Amino acid sequence: MKVLSSLKSAKSRHPDCQIVRRRGKLFVICKSNPRFKARQR
């Protein structure tokens, strides 16, 4: 999982990527390609 200051580029890396808010943090999850997971500081 990458830790990024901005998730805009992480969201557009794959069509299946979606942004989710969990525990007050923003996450990018990707079911079909899990290596594109990311979290915002």
Curated annotation (Swiss-Prot):
Keyword hit for Lyase: no
Keywords attached to this entry: Ribonucleoprotein, Ribosomal protein
GO biological process: one example: translation
A single Gene Ontology CC term: ribosome
InterPro entries reported in the protein's UniProt record: Ribosomal_bL36 (IPR000473), Ribosomal_bL36_sp (IPR035977), Ribosomal_L36_bact (IPR047621)
GO MF term (any one): structural constituent of ribosome
Disulfide bonds: none
Superkingdom of this protein's organism: Bacteria
Family: Belongs to the bacterial ribosomal protein bL36 family.
Protein known as: Large ribosomal subunit protein bL36
Biological source species: Aeromonas hydrophila subsp. hydrophila (strain ATCC 7966 / DSM 30187 / BCRC 13018 / CCUG 14551 / JCM 1027 / KCTC 2358 / NCIMB 9240 / NCTC 8049)
